[in-house]
Swiss-Prot record:
GO biological process: L-histidine biosynthetic process
Known catalytic reactions: 1-(5-phospho-beta-D-ribosyl)-ATP + diphosphate = 5-phospho-alpha-D-ribose 1-diphosphate + ATP
Record protein name field: ATP phosphoribosyltransferase
One Pfam family in the UniProt entry: HisG
Residues in the signal sequence: none
Cofactor(s) required for function per UniProt: Mg(2+)
Organism per entry: Mycolicibacterium paratuberculosis (strain ATCC BAA-968 / K-10)
Intrachain S-S bonds: none
Regulation: Feedback inhibited by histidine.
SUPFAM superfamilies hit by this protein: GlnB-like, Periplasmic binding protein-like II
GO cellular component, as recorded: cytoplasm
Pathway entry: Amino-acid biosynthesis; L-histidine biosynthesis; L-histidine from 5-phospho-alpha-D-ribose 1-diphosphate: step 1/9
Gene designation: hisG
């Protein structure tokens, strides 16, 4: 039986649970449940703190886990990323008091508060910067105001929380994070390989369905080459003749992001009846 870790709370918890449910796995009925067994698919789910998941997976006790890329990087656990899941996006960045033109080099000799000390130490070492890293488990932004730190390194979404504490982000992100499916570097047992491959394929199919649309349209045969260049699909678009020999019907998968621009381009070359449809799953 596969053993899979899922975030028990926080912004990653609900989307992770939804993806697994869409992939055909049993969901927990009570938010207080710490384990759920899916006897049909031979999977046991463990609901754990997102920050601990990489450690459990890296130990080899669990086969897979869903957590943030930033948390994986900070854990130093022996795991590998199998899939990016397309939710929980954020940037991990340095920030300091507003009103100063901060540069990364300015961190030399400073005190940096963070909930991700390993990630920060690795970044500073790569840059050849010596600084004091102070570990805090929450409310990192207030540390500068309280005089505990000179700067911080933290997850940044909209930047609103930084602004509330008169802080400004600077430098390139240490890590662009999102939810990821991770697997132990220790490998799995041979008798679970089929189940492991199935779980990855199912989740990948759900994620793909969230990121792509099916586009159908009628196209003048005279501009067929231009149209297929705009919508090449994954392998190749489907092209079917219409009753009017001068026209063809085209179907292709296109990225959800940017679909309106694609439809604009098709309309500009004379395509008609352009229809975008949601897809739920896709297997490669």
């Amino acid at each position: 039986m596969l053993r899979v870790a899922v975030p028990n709370k926080g912004t990653l918890s609900e989307p992770a649970t939804e993806i697994l449910a869409e992939a055909g796995y049993r969901r927990r009925t009570d938010s207080k449940d710490l384990t759920v067994i899916d006897p049909v698919n031979q999977v046991e789910f463990f609901f754990l703190r997102p920050k601990d998941i990489a450690i459990y997976v890296g130990s080899g006790e669990l086969d897979f886990g869903i957590t943030g890329r930033d948390l994986v990087g900070d854990s130093d656990a022996p795991v590998r990323e199998r899939l990016a899941l397309g939710f929980g996006s954020s940037s991990f960045r340095y920030a300091g008091p507003a009103g100063r033109d901060w540069k990364i080099a300015d961190l030399a000799g400073k005190r940096i508060a963070t909930a991700y000390p390993n990630l920060v130490r690795k970044d500073l070492a790569e840059r050849g910067i010596e600084a004091t890293v102070i570990r805090l488990d929450g409310a990192v932004e207030i540390s500068v105001q309280l005089g505990v730190a000179d700067a911080i390194a933290d997850v940044v979404g909209s930047g609103r929380t930084l602004s509330l504490h008169n802080l400004v982000a600077f430098g390139e992100p240490l890590c662009d994070s999102e939810a990821v499916l991770i697997e132990s570097d220790r490998g799995g047992q041979d008798d679970t390989q089929a189940a492991r491959d199935q779980l990855v394929a199912r989740i990948q199919g759900v994620v793909f369905g969230q990121q792509y649309l099916m586009l159908d349209y009628d196209c003048p045969r005279a501009v067929l080459d231009k149209a297929t260049a705009i919508t090449p699909g994954l392998e190749s678009p489907t092209i079917a003749p219409l009753a009017d020999a001068d026209w063809v019907a085209i179907r292709a998968l296109v990225p959800r992001r940017g679909v309106n621009e694609i439809m604009d381009e098709l309309a500009a070359i004379g395509a008609k009846a352009i229809l975008a449809s949601d897809i739920r799953f896709c297997r490669f």
